[in-house]
Design a protein with these regions (language model features):
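N-terminal positioning helix adjacent to the helix-turn-helix/winged-helix DNA-binding module
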Residues: 2, 8-12, 16, 137
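Basic, amphipathic alpha-helical hairpins
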Residues: 19-26, 73-75, 94, 125, ...
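Hydrophobic alpha-helical connector segments
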Residues: 71-97
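An amphipathic alpha-helical interaction segment
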Residues: 92-93, 143-152, 172-177
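Amphipathic alpha-helical packing segments from all-alpha helical-bundle domains
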Residues: 106-131, 136-151, 181
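C-terminal peripheral helix-coil segments that are non-catalytic and often amphipathic
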Residues: 155-194
């Protein structure tokens, strides 16, 4: 457990870093500039981070774990509203970071990693549910659903979270239900031709 002073120092550095990341790319953020913005000395920064990339990596790691916790066991159906809503609430709780993440200088690599959190579990589940559909169809559908969800979330973030979280969750669940109904129809069509 960190002591309170260390926690406050890290929080100041994280908040200042995220603020700077909204304004410029990471390779243009110096440790000196960050420390001045956070009103923290460089020695304190280096006691916790190797460089700004290390700081970003640690922030991403924390958010990634929170998203993983929210995503686990999510089956991407309309009936899975509570889990989808948990993901959306996690994004809302990480509002400042997500603002930077979806901004001009955000980490597209991090977003891609988030999209892959559940790919194997979901496509395995779909293989059992839709045994006559090929892997390309299932993987393409997964990508469509996750990237579509990400687009909805990005629009929500970029519009300053103007809609309630449960509205966004329901929109995503409705999209999933429509896509899964299409997969079900494809499954029945392929099975009927056998």
């Amino acid at each position: 457990m960190e002591n309170r002073r260390i926690s406050i120092t890290k929080q100041l550095l994280c908040e200042s870093f995220i603020s700077l990341l909204k304004q410029k790319p990471i390779d243009k953020i110096s440790v000196t500039e960050l420390c001045q913005a956070a009103n923290v000395n460089r020695g304190s920064f280096y006691a916790h981070y190797a460089d700004v990339y290390d700081l970003l990596g640690q922030i991403e790691g924390i958010v990634y774990e929170r998203l993983c916790d929210a995503v686990r066991n999510c089956n991407y159906t309309k009936s899975d509203f509570p889990r989808i809503n948990k993901i959306i609430e996690t994004v809302e709780a990480e509002r400042s970071f997500c603002d930077a993440l979806f901004g001009k200088y955000g980490s597209k690599q991090f977003l891609d990693e988030c999209c892959e959190i559940n790919r194997r579990d979901i496509t395995d589940e779909w293989r059992r549910k839709f045994p006559d559909l090929d892997d390309l169809t299932l993987n393409t559908t997964y990508t469509f659903m996750v990237k579509g969800s990400l687009g909805i979330i990005e629009e929500w973030v970029n519009n300053d979270f103007s809609q309630p979280a449960d509205f966004i969750s329901l929109s995503i669940c409705d999209m999933y239900a429509a896509v899964l109904a299409k997969l079900d129809g494809m499954q029945k069509s392929v099975a009927a031709k056998k």
